[in-house]
Design a protein with these regions (language model features):
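Alpha-helical structural segments
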Residues: 11-18, 22, 53-76, 80, ...
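Amphipathic C-terminal alpha-helical segment
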Residues: 102, 147-164, 178-186
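Conserved alpha-helical segments that form or flank metal/cofactor-binding pockets of metalloenzymes
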Residues: 95-101
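Amphipathic alpha-helical packing segments from all-alpha helical-bundle domains
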Residues: 108-135, 139-144, 170-184
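Secondary-structure edge/capping motif, primarily at the C-terminal ends of alpha-helices
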Residues: 70-74, 103, 107, 156-160
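N-terminal intrinsically disordered/low-complexity leader segments
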Residues: 1-7, 184-186
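Helix-turn-helix
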Residues: 11, 15, 19-53, 57
Length: 186
């Protein structure tokens, strides 16, 4: 008798991320995962208490992939650090459409922090270094930049628009310089 093939938690998460990448989060269910892994649904529910727990693991993995995009774009040194974060966000939207939608184009009205626009410390450090603005002004400056970047990224993620990277770079520079002027940072 052949030994049982052990399906690990990581196998399930990676397969689930693959399904989301190919189709969407709405297509993620135990049967689809089991079919892709060539197993029953039993290993899925042995490793995860619920599909919601698995969805959270998929979101965590998708965010890790996004963080990789950020790190690579910054490390390449093609753009100033702040601009590199915007370029990475847009590149992620273009290359990982469904993961981008999962992370950044979902209804958050039911979340506890709905309506808050707090940013992580790393982002705020980058904005501070780039602008020299005080804390509150800097946060609003970044919100304005992020809204612009998110608009471009959304057009890529939905297939509405496809621009070359030089044009995207120019657009981000123009928006950034325009906001700097608006904030009196010429």
């Amino acid at each position: 008798m052949a030994p049982k093939v052990k399906v690990t938690r990581e196998d399930i998460v990676e397969t689930s991320v693959g399904i989301v990448r190919m189709v969407s989060i709405e297509s993620l269910n135990a049967r689809a995962i089991a079919t892709a892994l060539n197993c029953s649904t039993q290993p899925i529910f042995s490793n995860f208490a619920s599909m919601e727990e698995l969805h959270l693991a998929v979101i965590e993995r998708a965010y890790s992939i996004y963080q990789g995009y950020l790190q690579r774009e910054v490390d390449e040194g093609i753009y100033p650090t702040y601009k590199a974060t915007g370029m990475a966000y847009i590149r992620f939207a273009k290359e990982e459409r469904e993961l981008f939608k999962l992370l950044f184009m979902c209804d958050r009205s039911e979340q506890q922090d709905f309506g808050k626009w707090e940013f992580d410390d790393m982002t705020l450090d980058i904005v501070r270094d780039s602008t020299g603005l005080d804390e509150n002004t800097m946060k609003f400056f970044h919100l304005e930049v992020w809204a612009y970047v998110h608009g471009i990224a959304t057009m890529f993620a939905t297939g509405f628009l496809d621009l070359d990277w030089d044009m995207v770079s120019r657009m981000l520079t123009d928006a950034y310089l325009g906001l700097r002027k608006q904030y009196g940072m010429e």
